[in-house]
């Protein structure tokens, strides 16, 4: 996924879930935060943040804010790492990834935002086989929380996430092949563990889903200021 135009600034504060104040080229700007999660470990006053710039872009003249905050530089013991925190990115990069499978592995049909039962699942896929059509369901979660080189999910309680795991587990029993895909929006992180301290119910539901046959995918990303791709 590519961002058309980016600009960097210095994070000041976050009055609510939706906006932040950022200093850009000496001016204090109100920007839209593309992640309604807490992100307290990332958005620290004084840190460098990356925004997509919509100024003078055709079709976006009526926007209330001219910038989307999409990424942040997090200081570590050795250096800084760039973490993409755009909550809309995971599904977009997964769709790009699915559509680029080699022919021998490609799905014959991919449907984003698929209605399954009383819920929406991120992706429904099909493959034609010698014995019929194989059906797949995939739920996608973005990981932006890192501690000591390990990713954790969620960064805040997610009853919706627990519900999704129960639905995938039930779908496995009906013959679907089901995946939970963690899109790791942090360079160098290869695994994601359940954040038991923040939401023990999610950790329990994850174990139950795995026992039911849900396959867990850890999708590492190449993270740049203006682009993120699954590697």
Describe the function of each predicted region.
Residues 9, 121-154, 168:
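Conserved catalytic cores of phosphodiester-cleaving nucleases, focusing on short active-site segments
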Residues 16-21:
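Short aromatic-glycine-enriched beta-strand elements
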Residues 40, 79-112:
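Acidic-basic catalytic patches of nuclease active cores, encompassing PD-(D/E)XK
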Residues 45-60, 220-221:
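Flexible glycine-rich surface loops and low-complexity tracts that mediate binding to linear polymers
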Residues 149-162, 166-198, 220:
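Nucleic-acid nuclease catalytic cores
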Residues 185-231:
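Domain-level recognition of nuclease-like catalytic cores that cleave nucleotide substrates
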